[in-house]
Amino acid sequence: MDRLPPPPPPPRQPLPRAQVLAEKAFSALEHFLHIEAVSGIVLLAAAGIALLWANSPASHSYHALWHTPLSFGIGSHLVSQSLHFWINDALMTIFFLVVGMEIRREIHEGALANVRLSALPMAAALGGVIVPALIYLAINTEMPQRQGWAVPTATDIAFAVGVLALLGKSIPGNVRVFLLALAIIDDIVAVLIIAVAFSGGLDYGGFLVAGTGILMVLGLQWIGVGTAYAYVVPGAILWLGMLKTGAHPTLAGVVLGMMTPVLPGRTRERPLDVAMRALLDLRARATARTPKPEHIAAPLKQLRHAQRELLPPVIRVQMALHPWVAYLVMPLFALANAGVSIDGVDLTSGGSLGAMFGVVLALVVGKPLGIVSVSWLAVRLGWCQLPPDVTWRGVCLVGLLAGIGFTMSIFIATLAFEDVNLLGAAKLGVLLASAIAATIGLTWGFIYARGRRPSMERADESTAAASD
């Protein structure tokens, strides 16, 4: 007996115009927020607002806001700190968590997974750390301004990649990969500097608390717990332990990021098979025009679970946190730290002018000089070679963009200087240097892209001729 053909699908009802417009608006917004240059623009806007606010007649409200006490407690245990502390020491832990996961991914499958691939960005990053530090120390020979030697060693990934994105597809993809690898190695060095140079006297009792948090994370991973929410409490314990030790608590984020698995969890059944079965089940149950929720709830739950298990945890968590870091954590950090009162910075006393000038010169000149010169030396000695489609002009572009220190440089400045005047001068230097480096980098990028167009056109013509 022949089987009857399946019934035709019910006719689709036209959506209300308001719903169509809303869906288009949200789709455009989602696409807009995933453009790399946008996060840099938001960060720049936050810094601009902070700078204007701190130099306006309402400047007292700016400083009063960040010194507002905020308390968290459980039972008799109470932690009370300023809003500035919670942003710099707690919220920035999420930023460092993403940094740790980026490092973990690069070590597993990226530019740091292969010694030959990582040799050039490692050499470039080494030059981009040592030369700026030496330039700063050459200008600032006395204490306490010498303590700011690490301020110009960092690179702001979001800003640098955002400026590069403004240049469009005319820049080879390998230039972007080179910049990302260099910036990630810069982050590793910055984390080591924070851990070694800017952690106070260690309280070893705190290591027991931090160790408890790490053991809890390992235990959850061992039994196969995949949901990220389960790791919030162990992460908080690790953060409290790092705070108690005297090390900077944001290092807890790096530790957690480096511990995030890079492979999908072990399951009894392949997630793809589960997803296919759930889709077939969903199609079989959803025959009515408006299927009952209880009929489709189970296959939808299976599909959602399979979708989650298909991605490695390091990618899944990074994708979930990226918009929060790009559009909340980093702009809040910029808003809380970029507000330098220009009238309040006395550049005539206490070496403040030297600190500011040292930061500017080290970032704008030292960064590209160190990156290009050490890269050239490493290639000349045969230790590594330039990636495909990357010329020395491209290396110069990377060096110029690496001079955008911004977020990480300001963060290190807040750790390096206790003197308010020196801290203000260093922050002002970072802001000036980042603006100058971005402007020069963008200008050089347009020149570099224009010079590549004739060769790209010749390559397209030769490809077309070969196909004919």
From Swiss-Prot:
The chain crosses the membrane at residues 32-52, 83-103, 119-139, 148-168, 178-198, 205-225, 320-340, 354-374, 397-417, 428-448. One of its GO terms (molecular function) is sodium:proton antiporter activity. It is a multi-pass membrane protein. Keywords: Antiport, Cell inner membrane, Cell membrane, Ion transport, Membrane, Sodium, Sodium transport, Transmembrane, Transmembrane helix, Transport. Na(+)/H(+) antiporter that extrudes sodium in exchange for external protons. NCBIfam families: NhaA. This is Na(+)/H(+) antiporter NhaA. It comes from Cupriavidus necator (strain ATCC 17699 / DSM 428 / KCTC 22496 / NCIMB 10442 / H16 / Stanier 337).
